[in-house]
Amino acid sequence: MSQAYSSSQRVSSYRRTFGGAGGFPLGSPLGSPVFPRAGFGTKGSSSSVTSRVYQVSRTSGGAGGLGALRAGRLGTGRAPSYSAGELLDFSLADAVNQEFLTTRTNEKVELQELNDRFANYIEKVRFLEQQNAALAAEVNRLKGREPTRVAEIYEEELRELRRQVEVLTNQRARVDVERDNLLDDLQRLKAKLQEEIQLKEEAENNLAAFRADVDAATLARIDLERRIESLNEEIAFLKKVHEEEIRELQAQLQEQQVQVEMDMSKPDLTAALRDIRAQYETIAAKNISEAEEWYKSKVSDLTQAANKNNDALRQAKQEMMEYRHQIQSYTCEIDALKGTNDSLMRQMREMEDRFASEASGYQDNIARLEEEIRHLKDEMARHLREYQDLLNVKMALDVEIATYRKLLEGEESRINLPIQTYSALNFRETSPEQRGSEVHTKKTVMIKTIETRDGEVVSEATQQQHEVL
């Protein structure tokens, strides 16, 4: 690990632990820490003291560095110029000594606070080390497990699930075959149903034709009955006419007999009348016999036609009844087949839904197990990363502890130095050659303290510390 990385790691870890306030400025040497000045006040007071630290580093000649050192020691906003060999006033030296003592006192207080914070920091480091040990034990325990056994268990469960999926696939294939067979039976039954429907339509057409024939025969029978009635009426009329003619002839005969009796001289017409009567009776008997024969023949023909039509109608009715029975039986069979088909389709859908739900459940179990495996792997990787991070933090903390130990040792050695009092300051002149050779680096730290109360600035003080490197 390089020195730059150690420095940046120390600073970042310190800032994470103690925050940005306080501490050591970047770029300052280990032997010269700079502590912030904090104002002191009572708890609950509305006044506050703000400390600002300004750090300036520059390279100058010997005379310029000495002038800057003078300004830093005096702590004033301006640097008075003195000639060579000129001595400072004792009051100014006492003020400088008093300021130095105050600074040392404040540094002791701040160092005590820093020691307390450092003790808290050490306690936190111990706590982190305990957590690190616990996590290391957890990681070792996790490493000590048998991951192959878990993998074997998961593989066994996956094989069992795959076997169940194959069984369900075979069952589904068998159900598909049964469904295809049922569909074939359904198609065959549908074809048979179509044939039966066609036969039913043909029977209905034949029945309609028979009904037309029956209607025609009924109309013919009614026509014949009407004709028979008309013939009967005609026969009755002819009989009545014949009787009227006979009565007229008899009346004529009686009149002729009376005339014959009255006129004895006229020829005898009785024989002629008897002949005429005989002729008319013969003609009437002949007409009556012919009418009866014609009526009987027509009645017999109509009776035969009616019997024939009645036989056809009876046969048609019988066939219609048979067709109706067949249609009813076929309808019942079709309804039964439809019920069977519906039940089979319902069973098939239920089986498909059950198999689909079971397959989805198995897929969910597989996905869940894979997710658990992935989660365990991620958790193991996370524990390893946390362990590595804790190791890095531990190394950084060890480095910071060593650094703070060096800083504390340097601060203790600096505090134990005797306090120098300056009663007089001697200045010496340097030649340009010496000025050119006395080039060094001076570090200037400006501490500006602003006291505010209720948002208003009450007092403001500026302090400077110079250090020549």
Swiss-Prot record:
Record InterPro entries: IF_conserved, IF_rod_dom, Intermed_filament_DNA-bd, Intermediate_filament
Region (Interaction with NEB): 267-414
Keywords: ADP-ribosylation, Cell membrane, Coiled coil, Cytoplasm, Intermediate filament, Membrane, Methylation, Muscle protein, Nucleus, Phosphoprotein, Ubl conjugation
Cellular localisation: Cytoplasm, Myofibril, Sarcomere, Z line; Cytoplasm; Cell membrane, Sarcolemma; Nucleus
Coiled coil: none
Subunit structure: Homomer. Interacts with DST. Interacts with MTM1. Interacts with EPPK1; interaction is dependent of higher-order structure of intermediate filament. Interacts with CRYAB. Interacts with NEB (via nebulin repeats 160-164). Interacts (via rod region) with NEBL (via nebulin repeats 1-5). Interacts with ASB2; the interaction targets DES for proteasomal degradation. Interacts with PKP1. Interacts with FLII.
Protein name: Desmin
